[in-house]
Amino acid sequence: MTTKKLYFLSISIIIIVAISIAIYITLNSNTKTRLTNDSQQQIDTIIEHDLQKGHIPGASILIVKNGKVFLNKGYGYQDVDKKVKASPTTKYEIASNTKAFTGLAILKLAQEGRLNLNDAVSKHVPHFKMNYNGQNETITIKQLLAQTSGIPSDITSEDSVTSKNNRLNDVTRAIMGDELHHKPGEEFEYSNMNYDLLGLIIQNVTKQSYTKYITNSWLKPLHMTHTSFKQTNYKSKHDAIGYELQGSTPVVSKPEFNLWDTPSAYMMTSTEDLEHWIKFQLNPPDKYKSLVQQSHKNLSSTIGEPNANAYASGWFTNNDEHLVFHSGTLDNFSSFILLNPKQNYGIVVLANLNSEYVPKLVEHLNTQIVNHKRYSTVASMLNQYKDQFNIVTVLMTTLILLAFIFSAYRAWQMRHGQILLRRSKRIAVLSWLSLCICIALALILYALPYLILGSNNWSFVLTWLPIEIKLALITTLIALFSTLIVILLFLHTKITKT
């Protein structure tokens, strides 16, 4: 009898472990798929879930992979009051994602020999000077690019910088002689003023306004014909209305802004135009390849910045995951652009509300699209295995029924005095071992989203998981604990001899 019990216990554990491993392997199958209509529906569910959670009125989403547009779509409203729906042509203020254009422009001027990255800022902006510990310090163009100039992040909130200082020259004069937080080149500190100064350098070197140079040198050649720079709070036909939350209700917001912040924060564009920018970043023409690659190279480490190892020329970088990205936030807009040049895909999310759910949405889309280097979308891949998951569901349901029948029969036997309870140290040890194994397997099931997808939990996964997979997982979990009950009953009961 003891041998049979041990055999039964071993077989039960092996079956449960095998099923769990099978599910894990199936989820991790090395399958590559492109976004289908079905997978786009799954992505729609994810996007709508996050937009609803963040109370975001409207957003436009772009996904480009291998040079092809997989998704370019608007969600919600660009204007809630007028019921104007968001679309790929809706223009948003992209905030700090403007910096990548400024950074690339500086690198191009350096490539052309019109400036040197090691030039002192004062060479191109003669009136500019700042101090550290009371002594005048030299700041280089490269240090502005790398955000290591030592210029305080909050320098433009000082009283000396007012709405009257609305030109780049004026604002740099207003801060002239101010104290740096750090000695130039020693420490990363993110400051819009670094890129505003780069914009002024572009103006002085090219003898054109910053906006004119960027438009003629980059936007027009890239066919970004509807991209512009914010000049007023007036909104045209395709411009999204910006909102701020009051409680959980978005209300129209038109905050004051400064034109001198244009090189770091005030480009206005759409996902339709950014499609060209993303394709250019991922697959640049030969004459620009080295320039784009240089713009993605680390210039400074960014200790303390979430998900980033370093800062490049207007981009944060994550070397571990080969990501190049930047967020953008204003009082009433937010944006996020993520690139993976190695795997050749990019994600853009533009929204007309400043919301923490914009970077979360990008993370969720990134998880779906690449899923750690294997396939384009998790949901699309899973749908290919519906039949296998249905088989798992049938097997688990059968196991549950058998466990129920066995338990019911054992209960009937106990009621009629046909079995006795058994107690021994060996049985206690086996019982605890079975319990521990079942708990461990349950924890593995609980941790599957993190183990497979990187950083998601079940509450998120269940919003898009196909019903076949949900049933397979639920029945597996129930079967796991049903098997535990059967094992415990088998170990702790003994049929009386008649």
Curated annotation (Swiss-Prot):
User: Looking at the keywords, is Nucleotidyltransferase present?
Assistant: no
Q: Where in the cell is it found?
A: Cell membrane
TM segment ranges: 6-26, 389-409, 433-453, 471-491
Membrane topology field: Multi-pass membrane protein
May I ask which residue range the UniProt record assigns to the signal sequence? none
Query: Any idea which UniProt keywords this protein has?
Result: Cell membrane, Membrane, Transmembrane, Transmembrane helix
Q: Name one Pfam family in it.
A: Beta-lactamase
Q: Could you tell me the superkingdom of the organism this chain comes from?
A: Bacteria
GO cellular component labels: plasma membrane
Classify the main location.
membrane
Q: Explain the purpose of this protein.
A: Its precise function is unknown. Has no penicillin-binding activity and is not involved in methicillin resistance.
Other information: Has two of three conserved motifs typically found in penicillin-binding proteins (PBPs) and beta-lactamases, but no penicillin-binding activity has been detected.
Q: What is this protein called?
A: Protein flp
Q: Which organism is it from?
A: Staphylococcus aureus (strain COL)
Gene name of the record: flp
